[in-house]
Amino acid sequence: MELPLSQHSFCKLLLLVVSSLLLWEKAASIPACLAEEGGCWNPLVETFNSAIHKAETLYDLANQIHVELYQNKFSSEQFSSLNSQVIRKDKTALRAGSYCHSTLINTPNKENEHINIEIKEYVKTLINFVGAWISPLYHLVLELSAMQDVPESILSKAKEIEENNRQLLDDLKWILIKVSPTEEMKEEFPSWGHLSFLKSSGEKSKFLAMFNLSNCLGYDAKYTLLNLRILKCLTTGKDC
């Protein structure tokens, strides 16, 4: 017997509702974080992975530009002269070669300090540590872009370093929001004492600032990488 049109439409609607309910029930039984084939996708873990990858890239690039500034004819003579001044214990060169402005930030140095510090305070400390390089790297790219005879290899590395550091800072800010949603972050980035040298019209002053930056950046990038790995372990329990 053929169903009336109204009954036929009702049956189709009922079938659609039942199908939707079955699909909803199946979806509800799947963990909320199962977004990809192969397992659970955790945004916090992925952001830590992203930050660690950027820190690794930053560390590699810092070492590369350090070597190139010592070897490239654009800067090798100036850097060799500054090294000689450091050996002679010239105060200005010695400070540029050994003092890093990021040391003004109170960071955990001992193993038990990493364990005892609150997660949110740890993240905030790293934000200020990474943020300490925002201004120096921005001005480095600015000054290198304006200088004559700057090798493209040095300029491109400086740009990539600046971009990676900025993105790393964004990752850390996102992590802070996730671990402490109500936390208010007061950014306290220390000023870079050699900024005035970099912005100077004198070539020797500019290279003195680059000498300081190249000697500190690799060390700080390695420190950031180490602490990101520790923080990921403490926060997510992964890769401990």
Curated annotation (Swiss-Prot):
Gene that this sequence comes from: Prl8a7
GO-annotated molecular function: hormone activity; prolactin receptor binding
A GO cellular component entry from the record: extracellular space
Cysteines paired by S-S bonds: 33-40, 100-216, 233-240
Naturally occurring in which organism (per UniProt): Rattus norvegicus
Localization per Swiss-Prot or TrEMBL: Secreted
Record family assignment: Belongs to the somatotropin/prolactin family.
GO process terms (BP): cell surface receptor signaling pathway; female pregnancy; mammary gland development; positive regulation of lactation; positive regulation of receptor signaling pathway via JAK-STAT; response to nutrient levels
Protein name per its UniProtKB record: Prolactin-8A7
Xref: SUPFAM superfamilies: 4-helical cytokines
Keyword annotations from UniProtKB, A to Z: Disulfide bond, Glycoprotein, Hormone, Secreted, Signal
